[in-house]
Amino acid sequence: MRSIIIATIVFIAVSLAGCQTAPTKKTDSPAVVTKMGVSEISPIEARPAVEAAYSQFVDVRTPEEYASGHAYRAINIPLDTLAANLDKLEKNEPVYLICQSGKRSMKAAEILDQAGFSQSISIAGGTTAWRAGGLPMAERK
């Protein structure tokens, strides 16, 4: 009977040892996730970074979309002109990108990555999610 109990304890201990998780790599921004090689962050988690004294926050929507209301502090560089306006951005500083839903900002992040920018981050859900989160907007007057 004693050998059965010992065997059971050993079996449980070995089974539990196999369930350990691998240590996770600590990052500066654990909220940033990567989709197809492009970093993405939620609007709530992006807010402190884009409200910093110096931040690069780019709205890649059309000028008409931008004029109808945009995330506070975002500058407008439409996606179709981004490649021609790379000189307006600092390559060695993070660039936060936003559009309407998150698709164009993901494309913009890919353009910046290919151009050698150190960190380009798409705002998940775009302006729609930004507004829904109650975050500051610059509305048309």
Model regions: which residues?
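Structural scaffold elements adjacent to functional motifs in cytosolic proteins
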Residues: 57-59
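Short, surface-exposed ligand- or partner-binding patches at beta-edge/loop junctions that are enriched
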Residues: 98
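Rhodanese-like catalytic fold shared by cysteine-dependent sulfurtransferases
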Residues: 2-8, 14-55, 64-94, 103-141
